[in-house]
A protein has these predicted regions:
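C-terminal helical cap(s) of enzyme catalytic domains, especially alpha/beta-barrels
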Residues: 80-96
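Low-complexity, intrinsically disordered regions enriched in charged/polar residues
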Residues: 77-80, 124
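Short acidic/histidine-rich active-site segments
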Residues: 71-76
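N-terminal beta-loop-helix "entrance" segment that forms/cooperates
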Residues: 47
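Short, basic, helix/turn surface patches
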Residues: 34-42, 63-68, 93-109
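Alpha/beta enzyme core
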Residues: 1-34, 41-43, 51-70, 84, ...
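Flexible C-terminal active-site loop/helix
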Residues: 94-145
Length: 154
């Protein structure tokens, strides 16, 4: 502990009691030592906690000194779930299935979601600018200006 910036706690299920005991033990000898907790996707969260407990789990850990809380493979699970749902929707309803996903993206835009404008989101404007510099402003193959994205999503 004296040589670590952060100490990682691992449990076999979401267990605030064990997390508290660990934190108290570390902080008794190393006050203020930052702690990390893996909110593992391998846990069946609903098996161990009700919704209320899950809702405050993050704050409960933070109060114990767990400054770094993370869900390993959260993106993996989210991407695979959405791709499964999209594939099924596309199989069942064709392009209407995809459009339903797109409409969800539009609805999320007011909350800060930006990926609906995927060309600008991934930096196409930057690469267009680099291409224009390299071509002395004479490039005819830039991607963003005059694109369907610019026309339909801005």
């Amino acid at each position: 502990a004296p040589y670590a910036d952060l100490i990682w706690m691992e449990t076999g299920n979401p267990d605030l009691g064990m997390a508290r005991e660990f934190a108290q033990g570390i902080h008794a000898k190393f006050p203020g030592k930052m702690l990390a907790y893996n909110c593992s996707p391998s846990f069946n969260w609903a098996k161990y906690m009700d919704v209320k407990a899950m809702t405050t789990f993050r704050e409960d850990l933070a109060a114990m000194g767990y400054k770094f809380q993370f869900i390993t493979l959260a993106g993996f699970h989210a991407n695979n779930t959405v791709m499964f749902e999209l594939s099924k929707a596309y199989m069942d309803r064709g392009m209407a299935g995809y459009s339903e996903l797109q409409q969800r993206e539009f609805a999320l835009e007011s909350s800060g979601f930006q990926a609906i404008k995927h060309q600008s989101f991934v930096g196409t404007g930057y690469f267009d600018a680099v291409q224009q510099v390299c071509q002395q402003g004479q490039s005819s193959t830039t991607a963003l200006a005059g694109s369907t994205e610019t026309e339909q999503f801005h």
